Amino acid sequence: MSEWRTRREKIIQLLTESREPLTIDEIAAMVGEDDRRKIIEDLEHIAKTVRKEGKRLLMEPARCNKCGYVFKSARVRPPSRCPRCKSEWIQPPRFTIR
């Protein structure tokens, strides 16, 4: 790829080459983007883009660090509170491309 890549191309390359799944904050820091909402928007679009190439954007779901509740929603946006114990100590979802 050339040196001039879009933010989405950078995210795709980052998620494809990373050994461990990455959080939205880690992705934002690595591509130099301050707005997490843009990264969330990009991830939703990237899921469609990589599917055309025969790959998948995989998401490790968010989890409550207090009670262990695993969020079932396939939403990219991280939850704010646990529905079971109301804790805000949430491990954010992690993403990778395989």
Regions from the PLM with identified roles:
Residues 34-56:
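Charge-enriched amphipathic alpha-helical scaffolds
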Residues 60, 78:
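Short metal-coordination and nucleic-acid-contact micro-motifs, chiefly zinc-binding Cys/His arrays
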Residues 63-67, 82-85:
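Short cysteine-rich clusters marking metal-coordination/redox-active sites
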Residues 90-98:
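Short metal-binding segments enriched for Cys and/or His
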